[in-house]
Amino acid sequence: VYRRGMSGISWFNILFHNLVEAADDICYEIMDIEDSHKLKILSFAETEHLLLSFFDEDIQQKIRQRIIDEELTDENEKVVYMRASVIGKLENECVAAFLAHEEEILAGTFEGSFIDHISERQKKAYKECEKISYSKIYQSKPVLDIELSGYQIMATLMEVFIEAAVN
């Protein structure tokens, strides 16, 4: 968010932060859905439903037809295509949010993130992905095992670095 009295690099850094935050929110949330399918936390049907819910029926059908036309038979490849479609859609939504709120952004009165200002269909689908991520993905055994491994690696590295620094 732009802050009154800021100019030049300071203003650019705040705007850049908002753009990076939107990209981060989009990629991590949608990639978590894709990864949960690969880890078999979510079924293909659940994953397809979540990803296609970002689009109206007409676009959903076009995506399904494109998957057929491209002869994608592997479920993971289908999910990759749907994930890429969702990320592209959300990028365009954030651009639209930026353009719709450009005056507020420049005046320093813009509130929230770009994700907060996307269209209702996409916002509802995004919130559903967040809900599923918290209820099913982040609490699942495979994800917790990976997280625990990461903590163990960090603890080992800290011990090695501290030992090296002390000696």
Region annotations inferred by a language model:
Residues 1-167:
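Histidine-centered, transition-metal-coordinating active-site segments
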